[in-house]
Regions:
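Hydrophobic alpha-helical connector segments
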Residues: 99, 113-141, 192, 196
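Alpha-helical DNA-contacting segments of helix-turn-helix folds
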Residues: 98-104
Length: 251
């Protein structure tokens, strides 16, 4: 074939250093090295798939039965792995729950970030972010694992740490955008962010514990939209937010 002849001729030409390119191309990686690399790759792939299967099954069972109602035996049986494989990846049931919690939180924050990504107006961004969060609250795994089970299983400190890692930054970004028209100290912006973050956490608890989660979500949206509308009206009319010194009575 002409193509092969061309390649052969090109390969036979000497390189600038004088050594034929064909000779350089003929050098092969030792077979034992290739076997080692391929073996390591297969082991890593198997290890990752085992861990993923454990988290998948644990998420399903924790959501359906709760943390206390789920045993490690059920998880390894569902994932079709041994307990030794589980302990290779996780120190125990709580560590596995934490991995599930992180996944659910990360999925939630990714959904909210996607929803607000292209929204330029800060007020519309706040409402869009709120609605995206309320949509997340309709997910059974989020309500059960993050809102209901998370604080008790992880403990308050770790729970807050995980929440701040995943969703606090979103709230902080939205609040900073909304308050950009006000001449506020950074500490006041941080305070507003904390207050709104607390309000969203409380809203999550209210919705997750409601019999009619759709109705509860609509009520939360109406309440927070009302607060945002007041802030927007004040901003557009040239008003300003009082600082801590403005609220103190004269002695």
């Amino acid at each position: 074939m002409p193509f092969r002849r061309d390649v052969a001729h090109a390969s036979a030409r000497p390189d600038p250093g004088g050594a034929p390119m064909l000779r350089r191309m003929s050098k092969k990686v030792p077979k034992n090295v290739l076997r080692s690399v391929h073996g390591t790759s297969r082991r890593q792939e198997y290890s990752a798939s085992t861990k993923r299967a454990l988290v998948d099954v644990a998420q399903e069972l924790f959501t359906e039965r709760g943390y206390a109602g789920t045993s490690l035996d059920e998880i390894v049986a569902g994932a079709r792995v041994t307990k030794g494989a589980l302990y290779h990846h996780f120190s125990g049931k709580q560590a596995l729950f934490e991995a599930v919690f992180e996944r659910v939180e990360d999925d939630a924050s990714s959904s909210i970030r996607r929803a607000i990504k292209d929204v330029k107006d800060p007020w519309e961004k706040a409402l869009t972010g709120l609605r995206a969060f309320l949509d997340v609250l309709q997910r059974p795994e989020y309500r059960r694992l993050v809102i209901q089970e998370g604080p008790a299983v992880l403990g308050y400190e770790k729970y807050r740490e995980q929440e701040e890692r995943s969703t606090y930054g979103i709230v902080q970004d939205i609040v900073s955008s909304v308050l950009a028209t006000y001449d506020l100290e950074p500490s006041m912006v941080e305070t507003f962010s904390r207050v709104f973050f607390g309000a969203m956490s409380a809203a999550g608890s209210a919705v997750s514990s409601a019999e009619d989660t759709a109705r509860a979500s609509a009520e939360v949206e109406a309440a927070i939209a009302f607060i945002l509308a007041g802030l927007r009206q004040q901003s557009e009319s040239g008003g300003k937010l009082p600082g801590p010194d403005d609220l103190r009575g004269e002695g």
